[in-house]
Amino acid sequence: MIDFDGYRPNVGIVICNKAGQVLWAKRFGQNSWQFPQGGINEGENIETAMYRELYEEVGLTKKDVRLLWASKYWLKYKLPKRLVRSDGSQLVCIGQKQRWFLLQLLSDENLIDLKTTKSPEFDGWRWVSFWYPVRQVVSFKRDVYRKVMKEFAGVLLNESKKPETVEKPRVERTEKRDFQKRDNQKREFRKSARMWNNSHQKGKAQ
């Protein structure tokens, strides 16, 4: 499917592990590496397309990951002239427009499978540092990768700073009330003692 501007709607997927590294995949039969990505079918929901591509390209399902973020806007890149092609109609694909997703791997990495289809996209993968792909991806995708990773970096930073929610034990509030009660009792006792002492001294004087 190609839009009237010549761009093919596409989803891109960044998968991170708990160490903050990202999954970097090698294109089948090539010395070219990239993030998983794939086209959106006509009438297909963007998120549905993402989970479909996730399974087709790396063998993971929705239960294996946690969706951390989805880019709000389309990001475009143009293809080099040698890669420009027609879809069989009068429309010519001049590039991709992409919506990107940041996922955190929850399952064991051994579940990653590059051979779920008869025509796999990748024949190898590895974990790399977060910014590594921006420097290593093919030049015509580099600007999109830079924007995506800049947006996702803020998301991961916020994730790492999230404190664990710990409810203050109810006993602490109870103890605080008990201390206040004892303080009030002490003040009342001292007040009564002074009144009794004054009254006793007056009785002696009489």
Curated annotation (Swiss-Prot):
Q: Name one GO molecular function term.
A: mRNA 5'-diphosphatase activity
Q: For the Nudix hydrolase domain, which residue ranges apply? A: 6-150
Q: Name one GO cellular component term.
A: cytoplasm
Alphabetically list the UniProt keywords: Hydrolase
Q: Which CDD domains match?
A: NUDIX_Ap4A_hydrolase_plant_like
**Would I find Hydrolase among this entry's keywords?**
yes
Could you tell me which NCBIfam families the record lists for this protein?
PRK00714.1-1 (NF001934), PRK00714.1-4 (NF001937), PRK00714.1-5 (NF001938)
Q: Tell me the HAMAP family matching this sequence.
A: Nudix_RppH
Q: Per the similarity annotation, which family is this?
A: Belongs to the Nudix hydrolase family. RppH subfamily.
Give a short account of what the protein does.
Accelerates the degradation of transcripts by removing pyrophosphate from the 5'-end of triphosphorylated RNA, leading to a more labile monophosphorylated state that can stimulate subsequent ribonuclease cleavage.
Q: What is this protein called?
A: RNA pyrophosphohydrolase
